[in-house]
Every structure is written in C-alpha cells, then in structure tokens.
Swiss-Prot record:
Keywords: Cytoplasm, GTP-binding, Hydrolase, Magnesium, Metal-binding, Nucleotide-binding
Domain Obg, first and last residues per copy: 1-159
Protein's organism: Buchnera aphidicola subsp. Cinara cedri (strain Cc)
Cited HAMAP family: GTPase_Obg (MF_01454)
OBG-type G domain ranges (all copies): 160-331
Protein name: GTPase Obg
Function of the protein: An essential GTPase which binds GTP, GDP and possibly (p)ppGpp with moderate affinity, with high nucleotide exchange rates and a fairly low GTP hydrolysis rate. Plays a role in control of the cell cycle, stress response, ribosome biogenesis and in those bacteria that undergo differentiation, in morphogenesis control.
Disulfide bonds, paired cysteine numbers: none
The keyword GTP-binding is annotated on this UniProt entry: yes
Amino acid sequence: MKFVDSVIINVSAGKGGDGCISFRREKFVPKGGPDGGNGGDGGNIWIVSNTNINTLTDYRIKKIFQSENGKNGLNSNRSGKNGKDIYIPVPLGTRIIDNDTKKIIIEILKINQKFLVAKGGKRGLGNTNFKSSINQTPRKKTYGTLGENKNILLELILIADIGTLGLPNSGKSTLITSMSNAKTKIDIYPFTTLIPILGTVKAKKKKFIIADIPGIIKNASLGIGLGIKFLKHLSRCKLLLHIIDITINKKKINKIRYIILKELKNFNKKLFQKTRWLIFNKIDLLKPKKISQIKKYIKKKIEKNKKYYFISAKKNIGIKKLSKDIIKYLYKKNKEYI
C-alpha cells in the first residue's frame, strides 16, 4: 500500500434551509395569522482523530466532501430539519492547512480530538418571526445562508519520540526491529525502507515510539533518493539517532556524518538543531582489535560533548543500554512524559 502523507480535499458545508411564508387556513379561523416555520441549519463538516488509521490513503480518490443542506421551513410553524454533519477521520499527527492561504488551521494531536473545519449555513426565518402589532400578516421570510467552502491540505507528520537517520544500509531498519515490535523489510539493497515505519520500544517498564525513514544520500535535498521527502516525519521527535555503518573505512566516518548533517541543514534548520546521538552499528562484523582502533579514532575526531554508542543491531549488542539511556533522556526532558 502506498504511503500517502499529503492530500488536498474540498469541504463544502450545507446551505441553511429557507424560511416559509404561510398563514393559518382553518375552518372558523378565516383570518389566521402567519405560521411559516424556519429552515434547518446546514450540516457541518468536522475533522476527527482516529487511532485506527495511519495514512491519508483514503483521500487519494475521495477528495470532495459535501454535508447536507438544511430543509426549508414548512407551514404550521414546522421547522425544516437540520442537515446531517459529516465527520472526516484522520490519523494523529495530521496538520490541517488552508490550501488557499497556506495558513495552518490546527494540528490533530490528541485522541478523540474534533475540529469544525467547515460550518454549515444559518437557517432562514419563516414569516411568523416578522409578525408585529403593525403588521399582522407579514409576507416576509429570510433565506438560508451558504455553508463554508474550503480547499484543505491534509499533511500527516508522524508522532514519534525518537527518529533514526542515516545512509541506506546503515542498519536503521535492523535497529528498529531489534528494539521494537516493528516489522521492517531488511535486505542488502539500498532503499529497502520505502515508507516511514513506527515501532514501540519498552524499557524499564516505560515505552517510547521510534520512527524509521528511508535512507538519506548525498544531494538528497536536491531530490535524489527517497529519504528527503520523509524528513518532515522527524520534526516532532525529541531525539535523533544517526546510524553509521562502522565497517566502512574509519577515515570516511566524519565525511558520512557531514553528508547527513548537510542534508538536514538544507531541509530544515530546526531539524538540524535537534539533539543527535551517533550510533555506530555492525560491530559484530569486526574483530575486537579493529573495534578498539576505531573507538580511539572516533574519540579523537568526535566533539567531546557528543554522545555516541557502539552496537550491533543484528546481534542485539548494546541495544538494552541504548534503550535505557533513551528512556532516561526522555524522562529528564519531561518528567510527566511517561
């Protein structure tokens, strides 16, 4: 299934029903007064959060939403029925944007969140409302007003605590699988992660959500590769894990770091400024002596305040400590977080 995280829809709320002009016409009441009822209000259109969906795929085809018009008023002071409301379910993390002005209207971030995106038109008034001491037989009514009509951009930005980034085949998917309950496709080919994937990690009786996006390559910000368009899904993360394949030539480690950093900076400065930990993966493929040499090299080259780990996602080496440290970091950032 294609991962759809951005779609434009049209929402058109119902028109209000018109008021009615009518007079009582009953036996023995030859000059009955006005009895025209009011119209009904037009139906509203609501955006509602739904935890059972995680993409906007449903709206690739269905793009127009029209709620019911209010019914016209009737005689005998009978009001027209209100138009039925429409509810549009979206995943948590969906941003609602006015596509004409490009203004963010609201972000859907809470369970059971509900937002009125297009209000139905107001009902028209029947002639009963215009009776007065000087006008006992009013022939006046008002018409229902039009409902709101908007072009809305729905943009999904995943909600995750931790995000992973790195070159293709650095082991991001293996790490997510090792740490969490996510099931990702793992191969030796580039771009085996084709869509963002979320996993839940439990450690020390607490848990966090971790996101994996397709690998980023050099010049990704110019449109090369797959990862750059999914970088927005890391914007809500509190911590980024930069995964590096330790089996490469040690002198290329910093070069690889800066490839990713450059693409981050080009994409979004706020994302570039997020806290990042370096995760050196695949230590199971090297002999202890080689690992020791690389550790010494990295200690010289990496900034003193930079946090880094040596792990094997495949062999589950160092994963437990990494998970615990992430929990500590998140808890320290916000004591009410977990």
